Amino acid sequence: MDPPAAVLLPPQSRTCTHLAEETCMDQERSPATAEAGRDSFPSGQLPSSSLTEADWFWDEHIQAKRARVETIVRGMCLSPSSSVSGRARESLRCPEKGRERKRKQSLPMHQGPLKSSPAWERGPKKGGTRVKEQLHLLKQQLRHLQEHVLQATEPRAPAQSPGGTEPRSSPRARPRNSCSSGAWTVENEPHQSSSKDLCGAVKPGAAEVLQYSEEPMLCPSGPRALVETLRKELSRAVSQAVDSVLQQVLFDPQRHLTQQERSCQGLASEGRNQPSPPGRSAYKDPLALATLPRKIQPQAGVPLGNSTLARPLDSPMCPVSPRGVPRSYQSPLPNCPLTNVPSHTWENQMLRQLLGRGPDGQWSGSPPQDAAFQSHTSPESAQQPWGLSQQQLPLSLTPVHLESRPLPPPVKMEQGVLRGVADSLPFSSIHIQEGLSPGHLKKAKLMFFFTRYPSSSLLKAYFPDVQFNRCITSQMIKWFSNFREFYYIQMEKYARQALSDGITNAQALAVLRDSELFRVLNTHYNKGNDFEVPDCFLEIAALTLKEFFRAVLAGKDSDPSWKKPIYKVISKLDSDVPEMLKSPSFLPGLFPS
């Protein structure tokens, strides 16, 4: 640079020119960049010939294209590690201001007569050949930057500098020391592209483009890159595991059941050959613990060592119908002792069974759960035949004994997964059931003779063979609500009928065993007349009939809530339920043993 030119240029232009000269040296001093570097000389060295107005518009078009290309190149050079601050964006606009200030100071000294021609200030810099050379240079630089970015985004392969000796550092951008300079440099960058025209061609709108386009250009570095890599690897591994399990389940479910049946048979033979001490586990293969179902039908003479096996895989919400297990797999295997199992072994084997892995690390599947089996509401369970729902032997353990046994630590798992694992096992159910059967409905109707408003604790005490949860409890409460509704409808009907027959005294009303009202109630609650209706129920029925008769006679039925006082009176007249109804084997004709 000539000394006069250095004197005439303002500080901002000199800074930009200094940066352009440094980048030109990095590009091996190519002729094109050297020629681009001379564009910032004082306009006193410009040729005296002027351009036509068409050439001036052509130069404006070329300058716009150059600005777009340089914006793309500059965006690829910048780092996404931090957003462009307001100070940096302001520095990108400084080169244009420096060039304008340079022209305004240099033109009066060397081109005084041409002050009014703005086209003369920009025209001589950009000849056709020079623009083509600069575009060619920018294309080469863009190609080099693309290769550099591809190398930087390759995972697990540490890229090296062109010399091959130093590893390239993470692409972090930093501003130059001068706040007026708009150039950004990348550490250890082998292909930096910049020139004097590059410093001045970035317009104020380009800074905003750079701010939003630099984020997806380069990959994150340092701890952020490590975190992203770990996330991708973990998600990929989990996806592969889930896909493998689903393929096994959907395409080959029977093979999984056959393998489980073989393993249980092998364990049964080991149990016969190696007797275990009482209270300890006879299994050394941990897979046996995972194949223990929640429903097991005990054989005669086979001891049940621990009642924790009765509820290892209980569903937390609603019951599952026994139809979920195929018919061919409901027969129990003989000589399969059920003994105490350590709690920590339960956790490991439950998780292994859910993941579908055996002890040898091989993946195995479970049969798909039919949509029809997912329905486990009480209407479906009530439609099951008694023979299917009551295929169990009497249990030697009392309910108090069952509740006193410690349970293994709970394993938090999805309800659908638990149901699919348990229903796929080749075992039948034990005495404790999760669904309600027609026998339970019949027993509830008989209990209505003694109590019209039972509590949940009373229901649990008189249904020891049912595994209670919210669905079971609410279903039984709904049963008794329906019983009461039918009962009150009949009482109101016969009270109005007595009033229409001309009866005016409520004391004349009574419910006898040969009356029509008793026949209707006995047919509904004691179908088949298998149970003798207690006398206390006849007294409660007569009292209810009188209460309805008095209310209708007094005209209280015009009030929408006229039945509530009657309900309150009847709710206080519940009597004790006989202890014989607690036995699951009560009434052999209804509850086959």
From Swiss-Prot:
GO cellular component: nucleus
Subcellular location: Nucleus
UniProt KW Nucleotide-binding keyword: no
Tissue: Expressed in testis.
Highest taxon of the lineage: Eukaryota
Low complexity composition bias: residue spans: 167-181
A GO BP annotation: nervous system development
Region named Homeo-Prospero: 433-591
Start-end of Basic and acidic residues biased regions: 87-99
Changes seen on gene knockout: Mice grow normally and body weight was similar to that of wild type. Heterozygous mutant mice survived to adulthood and appeared normal.
Compositional bias ranges of the Polar residues kind: 363-380
Family: Belongs to the Prospero homeodomain family.
Free-text comment about domains: The Prospero-type homeodomain and the adjacent Prospero domain act as a single structural unit, the Homeo-Prospero domain.
Name by which UniProt lists this protein: Prospero homeobox protein 2
Species of provenance: Mus musculus
Gene name linked to the record: Prox2
